[in-house]
């Protein structure tokens, strides 16, 4: 976006340079642009600036659980005695202001663990894993606000969100009270997944219609086959009824008549 705005500005400057001078006004003095005389910007420049401001999204605000920058790192706090009495320059070096992003995320995770989990040292519980994923997701979101085309971080962000959804579902089924507390402290809203979701494609619809048509044709053929069998059985039964049951009894009668 910055590159596009810069190109628009450069094109406007090139047009202003190549534009022919305005003929002299009354009084013999050469006239400059009306916008330059009035102290206004050219309309194309204003349009480019407004378009850039409309496209640019606001930066995500900081979270409420953000640790203060003047706080000291825990490792240094335990090692150095009387850390409050050291020089201001040393305090700034040992504070979170000069700490790395990894240390800040670690401190943020520890704060949330102390607030939610009963045993902060146990990182294998479901709520502890959800806290770690939430801190990671917020870090990815802040990164994506600055670098929107970073596909690797976007993939990790979506994978972390799916993993957190799965853990929240399991925690909701096992311990609902802890689930409510975790969602409230983290500011996470859990939505129930639909019972059945399948994205409909044209290929799927065509295949389903073909399967239904084949099933109907098979049922029709089976019905015809059953009808033919019934007709053959009926014809056979009628034929058997027309023939005498004991033909050996009928032969002596004919001989006696002769």
UniProtKB/Swiss-Prot annotation:
One Pfam match: Ribosomal_S15
MF term (GO), any: structural constituent of ribosome
Main localization (coarse): mitochondrion
InterPro entries, per database record: Ribosomal_uS15 (IPR000589), Ribosomal_uS15_bac-type (IPR005290), uS15_NS1_RNA-bd_sf (IPR009068), uS15_ribosomal (IPR052137)
Subcellular location: Mitochondrion matrix
Keywords for this protein: Mitochondrion, Ribonucleoprotein, Ribosomal protein, Transit peptide
One GO term of the biological process aspect: mitochondrial translation
Chain residue ranges for the region called Disordered: 229-258
Alphabetized SUPFAM superfamilies for the sequence: S15/NS1 RNA-binding domain
Transit peptide: 1-57
GO cellular component: mitochondrial inner membrane; mitochondrial ribosome; mitochondrial small ribosomal subunit; mitochondrion; nucleolus; nucleoplasm
Family note: Belongs to the universal ribosomal protein uS15 family.
Subunit structure: Component of the mitochondrial ribosome small subunit (28S) which comprises a 12S rRNA and about 30 distinct proteins. Interacts with METTL17.
Protein name: Small ribosomal subunit protein uS15m
The gene coding this protein: Mrps15
């Amino acid at each position: 976006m910055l590159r596009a705005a810069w190109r628009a500005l450069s094109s406007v400057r090139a047009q202003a340079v190549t534009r022919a001078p305005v003929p002299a006004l009354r009084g013999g003095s050469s006239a400059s642009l009306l916008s330059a005389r009035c102290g206004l910007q050219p309309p194309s420049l204003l349009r480019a600036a407004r378009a850039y401001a409309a496209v640019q999204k606001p930066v995500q605000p900081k979270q409420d659980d953000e640790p203060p920058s003047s706080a000291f790192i825990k490792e240094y706090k335990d090692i150095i005695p009387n850390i409050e009495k050291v020089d201001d320059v040393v305090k700034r070096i040992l504070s979170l202001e000069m700490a790395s992003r990894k240390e800040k995320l670690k401190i943020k995770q520890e704060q949330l663990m102390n607030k939610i989990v009963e045993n902060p040292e146990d990182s294998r519980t479901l709520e502890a894993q959800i806290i770690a994923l939430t801190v990671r997701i917020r870090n990815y979101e802040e990164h994506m606000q600055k670098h929107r085309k970073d596909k690797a971080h976007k993939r990790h962000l979506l994978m972390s969100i799916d993993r957190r959804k799965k853990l929240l579902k399991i925690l909701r089924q096992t311990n609902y009270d802890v689930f409510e507390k975790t969602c409230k402290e983290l500011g996470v809203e859990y939505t129930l997944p639909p019972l059945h979701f399948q994205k409909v494609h044209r290929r799927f619809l065509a295949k389903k219609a073909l399967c239904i048509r084949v099933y109907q044709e098979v049922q029709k053929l089976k019905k015809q086959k059953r009808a033919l069998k019934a007709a053959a059985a009926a014809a056979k039964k009628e034929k058997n009824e027309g023939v005498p049951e004991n033909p050996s009894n009928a032969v002596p009668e004919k001989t006696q008549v002769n």
